[in-house]
Amino acid sequence: MENMPPQSWILTCFCLLSSGTSAIFHKANYSRSYPCDEIRHNSLVIAECNHRQLHEVPQTIGKYVTNIDLSDNAITHITKESFQKLQNLTKIDLNHNAKQQHPNENKNGMNITEGALLSLRNLTVLLLEDNQLYTIPAGLPESLKELSLIQNNIFQVTKNNTFGLRNLERLYLGWNCYFKCNQTFKVEDGAFKNLIHLKVLSLSFNNLFYVPPKLPSSLRKLFLSNAKIMNITQEDFKGLENLTLLDLSGNCPRCYNAPFPCTPCKENSSIHIHPLAFQSLTQLLYLNLSSTSLRTIPSTWFENLSNLKELHLEFNYLVQEIASGAFLTKLPSLQILDLSFNFQYKEYLQFINISSNFSKLRSLKKLHLRGYVFRELKKKHFEHLQSLPNLATINLGINFIEKIDFKAFQNFSKLDVIYLSGNRIASVLDGTDYSSWRNRLRKPLSTDDDEFDPHVNFYHSTKPLIKPQCTAYGKALDLSLNNIFIIGKSQFEGFQDIACLNLSFNANTQVFNGTEFSSMPHIKYLDLTNNRLDFDDNNAFSDLHDLEVLDLSHNAHYFSIAGVTHRLGFIQNLINLRVLNLSHNGIYTLTEESELKSISLKELVFSGNRLDRLWNANDGKYWSIFKSLQNLIRLDLSYNNLQQIPNGAFLNLPQSLQELLISGNKLRFFNWTLLQYFPHLHLLDLSRNELYFLPNCLSKFAHSLETLLLSHNHFSHLPSGFLSEARNLVHLDLSFNTIKMINKSSLQTKMKTNLSILELHGNYFDCTCDISDFRSWLDENLNITIPKLVNVICSNPGDQKSKSIMSLDLTTCVSDTTAAVLFFLTFLTTSMVMLAALVHHLFYWDVWFIYHMCSAKLKGYRTSSTSQTFYDAYISYDTKDASVTDWVINELRYHLEESEDKSVLLCLEERDWDPGLPIIDNLMQSINQSKKTIFVLTKKYAKSWNFKTAFYLALQRLMDENMDVIIFILLEPVLQYSQYLRLRQRICKSSILQWPNNPKAENLFWQSLKNVVLTENDSRYDDLYIDSIRQY
C-alpha cells in the first residue's frame, strides 16, 4: 500500500465510494414490503399480493408470513423454490392465475412441479381455482385441510390423486366439466374412501351422472348440484350418517327461461329419488332440491329428517304440492322453506292455494313464495300461516299480484319482513282499486352480470330482501316495483306497526299533503326513490312524526320543469329526521324559501343536483340554502356541476360539519383558507374535480382534518411543508393525479403524525435519481401504508416506463456529497493527465535540456570551446538498418571523402566515436566538432529517439552559436506534414536533398551535397526571408 502509485489510490477511492453508495441503495430497495402488502392481524401475518401482475412468486416476502394471497396474477409455474423461504405458511391463494381470457399468455395453464409444496409442513389451505389444471397436483403436504380446484379442466379423480391427503377436510372440485365439457367427469371407485377426515366435498357442475360410491362417513356437506344425476338410489347416501348439508339442485333442471345453458332430462322428467334415499341422513339440516323438475314430494323422503332446518324447492312444478303439502307434516324443525318459481306454464291463477299442513311448521321463520303467479291475495288465504309462532319473513315478490288485502298480514306475532316487490299492486283511493292502471315503465328485473359465481347458488340469492339499514328500525314492508302511483288514506290500513317502508319504482306522481301515511304513523325509514313526486305542499310527511330516514332520490321529473312549484319547506316539520337523501333530482330552483331548515338533520345527500345554477345567481339568493341546518354533520354535494364555489356560499355552510363531500364536480380552484371556519371537519372529499393547487401548509386552515380525498384531479406537485403540522391527518388520497415528483420536505412533519394511509397509485413519476429522496422517506416511514404500491409506477425515462418505483434500481445513483467528491477527484485526475500530456508535447525538449544542463553544472562540467572543428560533417543515420549503413559507407563516404576534387572529412559513428564514452557524450562531441550535421532519414529512423536527440543537439547550436548546421538527406518520403521541414524548405531549400529515383541524376545529387557541405547555409537563404528579417 505504501508503494501504491497515485493513480491506483484514486481508482481505489472511486471504487470504494461507488460500492458504498450501491450498498446504501441496495438496502433501501427491500426495507418496505414490495410488491406485496404485509398486514398483521392477531397471530397472522398476511401478505396481500393479489392483482399485482406478477409472473412468479416474489422472493422478497418476509419469512414470518402465514397467509399469502397471490390471486389474479399471471403466475403459471410453481417450483420447489417458489415457497422455499416461507416455511410458516398456513394458507396459499393462487386463484385466477391462468385465466382462459389470456390464452396467449397461459396456453397450457398452471404448471405445478411434483412436490413443489411438500416442504410446507404447516400448510392447511390451498386455493387453486380457475388455473386450467388438468389434474390434482401431486406431492401435496399431508398437513393440508382445505383444497379448492374449482373451475379447472380436471375430468378425472383417481386414488393416486388423493393419496397422501389423509388429513384433508374440505375438497372443492366443482365447475370442472359442465358447460363446455363433452365428456364424463370420472371418479374412480373409492377415490375418496381414504380421506377419513373429509367433511366438505363439492362436485357440483360436473358431468357425473351418478353419486360417487364409497364416500367417507366423515362427510358433513356434500354438493352435487348440476351434475346431470337422474337417479338417486337407496344406497347412494348410506354410511353418511354425519351429513348435515346435501345439495342436489339442478339435476334434471327446469329449463324454462333459465339464465344459463340448460339441458332438461328426457321428456322434461324429474329427478328420480328412491323413497328411502335419505333414510340414513338423520343429522341433515339443509336440503336443496331446487330445479329438479319435481312434481310431487313423497313424505317418505323426510321420515328420518326431523332435524331439517332449511329446505329449497324453488324452480320446480309444485303448485299442487303447495296445495296438498303432505310432506310438511314430517318437518317439525324446518325454519326456512323456499317454494319460489313453481308456477305452471301459461297459467295466471286467481288465488294462491296454501295447504293447511303449513300450520304444522311450528319452527318456520322464513317462507319464500316468489313466482307462484296469482292475481289476488285475501286474508283467508293466509289463515294457515297466522298460527305459526316464529314466522318472521314472508316473501311474495314477483307474483304479479294485482289486488291485495293488507289485513292478511295481521295477526302474525313475529312477522318482521313483508316482501311484495315486483307485483302489480295498485293504488286504493276511497275504497276504489286502481289495479287496472298498469305502469309499464318499471325497473327491469334483470342482472348485469355476464359471469356466474361458482360460490353462489344458482337458484336462490343469499342477499337480504330489504336493506339492513331499513330493517334495523323494525317491521318492514317492501312495495317497490308496483303500480302505487297515488297513495290513498286507506291504502295501508292494518299496518300501524310498520317502521320500514319501501315504495320505490312506483311512478308515483302525487303531491303529498300530510295525510297519506296517517295509518302508518310509526314509520322511521321511508324509501320513495325513483318516482315522480311533486313537492308542492309544505305539509308533506307531517303525519310521520317518528320519521328518521327519508330517501327522495331520483325524483327529478317535476324538478326539471321550470314552471312547476318546488317546495322543500316540509323538512322543518320533521322534528326527528336525521338522514335526508335528495340526490339526483336536478334541483336548480326552489319556490319561496331559499333555505332548508331543520334542527334534527344530521346527514344530507344533495348530490346530482344543480348547485352551479343555485349558487351562481347574481343576487346570491341561495348562498345560505344549508345555513339553517344547525346540527348537520355530513353534507354530500357531489356531482353538482360546480365550476366554482362562491366564498359567501361556502361560509354559509353549517359550522357543525364533520364530513363534506364535493367530489365529481368541475372545480378548478378551491379556497383552502375558508376551512378554518369549520373546526370540527374530519373528512373532506374533493376527488374527481379539476384542481391544480394545494396549500403550502394544510394544517394552517384545517387542523382537525383526518381524511382528505384528492384523487382524480390535476395536482402535479406537493408544496414544501404541505403536511408539516398536519398531526391529525390519517388518510390522504392523491391517486390518479399528474404528480411526477414528491420531495421529502412535502411529507415531513414537525411533530408526531397520525398519517397511516397514503394513496399514490395512478400517478406517473419521473424515475430519475431525484426520486431517491422520496424513496428514502418511504423507507423511514414504514408505519404508513401505501395501498397498491405496485401500481405507483414510472412514466420516464423510457427504460423505466410502467415499472413500479419500488423496483427502480438506484444503485447507479449517488448522494450530492459523494457526487461532489467523485467529481473533484475525476476532474483533478483528468486535468493533471491532460496538463502532463500538454507539457510533454510542448516543452519536453526544454525540460530535458534544462535538466541535463543543470545536472552537468552540478557535476562540474564546463562548456567546451566549439570554435575548433575537426570534421566537415557529422553523419547521423540508422546504424541498425543494414541497407542504410551500406549506403552511407560505400556511397556517401566514397563520393565525399574519396572524390578527387575537394574531398570532405566526415565523422561516422561506427568509425570515429571514442569507445567507452557514453552515447550522449560521443553524440554531442561529434556535432560540436563538425561544421555540418547531415541527417540521413528513413521512415523508421525519423521516429527513433537517436534522431530526435541528435536533431535537438544540432538545433541547439543555432540557438547558442547562431550557426545553421543542419542538412537533410531523404532516402524515403518522410515528415511530409512536419511544419519545421516545410518552413526550412521555404527558407533554405538547398539544405534538403532527396535521393533521386533516376540513376542518371545521382552525379548531380553528389555535387549538390558537396556544395551544401562546403558552404554556409545562411548564404543560401531565400532573399524574401532575409528582407523580412531586416525590417525588424
From Swiss-Prot:
Cellular component terms per the entry's GO annotation: endosome membrane; external side of plasma membrane; lysosome
Disulfide-linked positions: 36-49, 177-181, 252-265, 255-262, 470-500
Domain TIR, chain residue ranges per copy: 869-1013
Signal sequence, renumbered to the chain: 1-23
Entry's Gene Ontology BP terms: cellular response to mechanical stimulus; defense response to virus; inflammatory response; innate immune response; negative regulation of interleukin-12 production; positive regulation of canonical NF-kappaB signal transduction; positive regulation of innate immune response; positive regulation of interferon-alpha production
GO molecular function: DNA binding; double-stranded RNA binding; single-stranded RNA binding
Superkingdom of this protein's organism: Eukaryota
LRR repeat positions: 41-61, 62-85, 87-109, 120-143, 145-165, 166-194, 195-218, 220-239, 240-267, 281-304, 306-329, 331-360, 361-384, 388-411, 413-436, 471-494, 520-543, 545-572, 574-598, 600-621, 629-652, 654-677, 678-701, 702-725, 727-749, 752-776
Glycosylated residues, chain numbering: 29, 88, 111, 122, 160, 182, 231, 242, 268, 288, 304, 353, 357, 411, 502, 513, 581, 671, 743, 754, 783
Localization: Endosome membrane
Predominant localisation class: membrane
The keyword Transmembrane belongs to this UniProt entry's keyword annotation: yes
Residues exposed to the Extracellular side: 24-818
InterPro entries: Leu-rich_rpt (IPR001611), Leu-rich_rpt_typical-subtyp (IPR003591), LRR_5 (IPR026906), LRR_dom_sf (IPR032675), TIR_dom (IPR000157), Toll_tir_struct_dom_sf (IPR035897)
Reported function: Endosomal receptor that plays a key role in innate and adaptive immunity. Controls host immune response against pathogens through recognition of RNA degradation products specific to microorganisms that are initially processed by RNASET2. Upon binding to agonists, undergoes dimerization that brings TIR domains from the two molecules into direct contact, leading to the recruitment of TIR-containing downstream adapter MYD88 through homotypic interaction.
Subunit relationships: Homodimer. Interacts with MYD88 via their respective TIR domains. Interacts with UNC93B1. Interacts with BTK. Interacts with SMPDL3B.
Protein known as: Toll-like receptor 8
